[in-house]
Curated annotation (Swiss-Prot):
It comes from Saccharomyces cerevisiae (strain ATCC 204508 / S288c) (Baker's yeast). Present with 1480 molecules/cell in log phase SD medium. The gene is SCY1. This is Protein kinase-like protein SCY1. Residues 666-804 are annotated as: Disordered. GO terms for cellular component: cytosol; mitochondrial matrix.
Length: 804
């Protein structure tokens, strides 16, 4: 729906749809919304708009006027505009619940007239006029309900009573287009353009109809189809003119047709009325008004009798009819006056309303009752001394009516009022039982997340933990009976972390046996629904009963049922034997049990014990069978020896220690003799297990004794550059020698500190008789020795700690 607005007057305050919601000649009615967010402003309004340009073009098109500037033509145009002004201005003068409420006065612009009223959804013309549009009839069907029509007629009578007896006006325009219906199904009188005041001290006056021109729009003259004959025939003005119009309107409401079809011609009207009188003389009133309810039918002659003195003397006399004595109608009347009543009267009314609700149409309950009751609830909650019974009863009615709404409508209309910061804390304390009783409806009508977080959890927390009122025990019992509903909403973590602690704490601390008994039932339900697991049951639930002191047979009987359900989630034999069976034996020996109760315990104990034994024996049988099958297969299966490669096995057993650096000593020089390492001859031989097989390689036998540093210095060597040559490049190395290790011990061979190339064959590595020969390319691992400070720079490649 498109909304538009301008910058001045009504259009600056309201935005409204680009197309009208409906039309009521001569006005187009738009649905508008205030731009301001003030709490006092209505959420929706109706904007009545008349297109002056379209009207003037219509007059020109049909030759009613020759030009817009002609003096005679201007008079005609202004007469029409004066009728429109009267319609809006008289609304401002007459204030009554059954007269259309004016919100913004008439604004005159160059292109249009407009004014703002309370929000209306339709007129009687659009709702009750007989049509072949089935969809339209279905959508408006609730407005045609008997009780709605009964009440609507009553509201029209009340409005006419005000206009006649208080304001001394004759309406003269009671017709379907002049009666509007608001969203609460209330009927509102409008069309006050022909309002005429009766002179003081008299009940009659004269009224002359203007000359009829069939070309002019209908709003410029009285609608003759709903005009009393004394005006047309005798020009007599009286309050009873409106009685006749009301009778014709009643006929329209129950038939969807006009009783007269005069085409707004006085001559046609006289013909139509003569036909009507002839029907009356040949047929009874009951036949002509057969569709009008029997209780109302006898009122018709007193409304539309040709003789004005045969009509009701006062419009209020019709209210004595049995038609208006219906309890439902009286209920609706009292509902309108409800804000003026005291709390005691309100409570009596609300209590009686509970029984009458099913007799009202759901649409009327939703549109009429619900807004009033929501407002009433907020008033009750805002009082300094809150009435528990008034709050509870009004909440109960609201939820019952809300159950007829869709979830979306309930969430939009009811939920915000109930869960407001001002109302919900009061409802928790003052209407606790009502909330509990209606949890199922709230669960269906409120979004799952909102219901869980904003209704269910606060309610459980308050009732099971915080409540200290006189009815706490009753509330706890009622709420605990709703555990199955709660488990449908709560997930496993919430049950474990929120609900179970509340129940456990309540079971431990409550002094009420019935509450304690109900807690046991809740635990049983949670086990049956598998809302808790075996660990939670064994660690949280079962320990509660170990410390329980009471041995009342009622709670012991409840516990027996719980114990019988425990194996549903606890299948561990050890837990059953260690925790469940001892509790059952303990409780079974209570002296408070009767013989039958004791027998129940013994049967349960024997059954659980038997089940445990059977299960355990089955486990043992499975184990023996498994062992037997394995042994049989081992006997019949041939032994397969896996072939292994000796070299692979030997390679896996080689252990070589890592090379370890030896730091140089401060102040040493290559001229000094390094301390001798242990002789390789004195070292432990290699572990034969770690020796690698040398299949396919020649064995290298080293028989020469190790060469000591002293013998090495005496051998003939060839120098590469002088050892004291200052120009020689010094190589700063942290380590210049290596220390050799084997897997069985550390062997360090130190070379002479001289920068020489040895020209003699290196001495072979010593070995002992028990040592294992190594294959070619293998030797004891090399380890670096730190050089001493002051030694000459010797390339690392020239000095070795051990020889291959």
């Amino acid at each position: 729906m498109m909304f538009w607005s301008s910058k001045t007057g009504i259009t600056s305050k309201y935005s409204f749809s680009s197309s009208p919601t409906f039309t009521a000649e001569p006005w187009s009615i738009y649905t508008g919304r205030p731009k301001s967010s003030s709490s006092s402003s209505p959420s929706k309004v109706s904007i009545f708009m008349f297109d002056k340009k379209q009207f003037e073009n219509y007059l020109l098109h049909y030759g009613i006027i020759k030009s817009k500037s002609g003096s005679r033509d201007k008079v005609l145009i202004q007469e029409a505009y004066e009728i429109l002004r009267n319609q809006a201005n008289n609304l401002a003068k007459l204030k009554h619940p059954n007269i259309l409420t004016l919100i913004e006065p008439l604004e005159e612009h160059s292109k249009n007239f407009m004014f703002v009223t309370e929000f209306v959804t339709s007129s009687l013309e659009t709702v009750f006029r007989e049509t072949d549009d089935e969809e339209q009839n279905f959508l408006q069907g609730h407005v045609k309900d008997n009780i709605v029509v009964q009440r609507g007629i009553l509201q029209l009578v009340n409005a006419l009573d005000f206009v006649h007896n208080r304001a001394s006006f004759v309406h003269l325009n009671i017709q379907p287009r002049a009666i509007f219906i608001n969203e609460n199904s209330d009927w509102k009188i409008s069309g006050l353009g022909y309002l005429v005041k009766i002179p003081p001290g008299t009940n009659t006056s004269e009224y002359f109809l203007p000359q009829y021109d069939p070309r002019v729009p209908p709003f410029m003259h009285l609608q003759l189809n709903y005009t009393a004959p004394e005006i047309v025939f005798e020009n007599t003005l009286t309050f009873k003119n409106d009685y006749f119009s009301l009778g014709l309107l009643i006929y329209f409401l129950y038939t969807g047709k006009d009783l007269f079809r005069s085409e707004n011609s006085t001559s046609e009207y006289k013909l139509e009325y003569n036909k009507f009188e002839s029907k009356i003389s040949t047929m009874s009133w009951d036949n002509i008004f057969s569709k009008v309810p029997q209780k109302l039918r006898h009122c018709i002659p007193k409304l539309i009798n040709r003789d004005i003195y045969s009509r009701y003397d006062n419009i209020t006399l019709i209210l004595d009819s049995e038609f208006f004595q219906d309890p439902l109608v009286k209920t609706l009347n009292f509902l309108d006056d409800l804000p003026t009543k005291n709390n005691e009267e309100k409570y009596v009314f609300l209590e009686g309303l509970v029984n009458l609700l099913p007799e009202f149409p759901p649409a009327l309950l939703q549109k009429k009752f619900l807004p009033i009751l929501l407002e009433l609830l907020s008033q009750f909650c805002a009082e300094k001394v809150v009435s528990d019974k008034c709050v509870g009863k009004s909440l109960d009615l609201i939820i019952k009516i809300g159950s007829t709404l869709s979830q979306l409508s309930f969430q939009e209309k009811v939920y915000p009022v109930l869960l407001s910061d001002a109302n919900f804390p009061v409802l928790l304390k003052k209407a606790t039982i009502c909330l509990i009783d209606n949890l199922d409806t709230l669960k269906q009508k409120v979004k799952r997340s909102d219901f869980l977080e904003n209704i269910l959890k606060p309610l459980f927390n308050y009732v099971l933990h915080d409540s200290e009122s006189d009815i706490t025990v009753v509330c706890q019992e009622k709420l605990l009976s709703q555990i199955p509903l709660a488990l449908e909403v709560l997930d496993f973590p919430t049950v474990k972390q929120f609900l179970l602690p509340l129940l456990s704490n309540l079971f431990t601390k409550t002094t009420s046996l019935t509450v304690k008994n109900t807690c046991v039932t809740c635990f049983q339900i949670m086990i049956e629904h598998k809302s808790i697991d075996s660990y939670t049951c064994s660690e949280t639930v079962l320990p509660l009963f170990k410390s329980m002191k009471t041995r009342d047979p009622r709670i012991l009987s409840k516990l027996l049922k719980l114990f019988e359900t425990v194996p549903l989630i606890i299948t561990d034999e050890i837990v059953l034997v260690d925790q469940v069976l001892p509790l059952m034996w303990n409780y079974s020996m209570a002296s408070t049990l009767t013989k039958s109760q004791y027998s129940g315990y013994t049967k349960a104990i024997n059954k659980m014990s038997s089940d445990i034994q059977k299960h355990h024996i089955a486990k043992l049988d499975d184990k023996v069978n498994d062992i037997g099958e394995d042994a049989f297969h081992k006997v019949i299966e041939p032994t397969i020896m896996k072939k292994e490669d000796p070299e692979t096995v030997a390679a896996k057993n080689i252990e070589v220690a890592a090379m370890q650096p030896v730091k140089k000593k401060t102040g040493s020089s290559y001229g000094e003799t390094l301390p001798q390492s242990k002789s390789i001859l004195n070292s432990k031989p290699l572990n034969p297990k770690n020796a690698l097989a040398t299949r396919g390689f020649p064995t290298r036998i080293l028989n020469s004794p190790p060469q000591t540093p002293s013998s090495r210095t005496g051998s003939k060597v060839m120098t590469k550059g002088g050892s004291n040559d200052a120009s020689s490049t010094k190589v700063e190395e942290e380590f210049n020698e290596f220390q050799s290790f084997s897997s069985t011990g550390s062997i360090r061979q130190t070379s002479a500190p001289s920068d020489v190339w040895m020209n003699s064959t290196p001495s072979p590595t010593p070995t002992s008789a028990s040592s294992t020969n190594l294959p070619p390319g293998f030797s004891i691992s090399l380890q670096p020795n730190k050089r001493k400070d002051g030694s000459s720079d010797i390339p690392r490649s020239n000095v070795y700690g051990s020889l291959i």
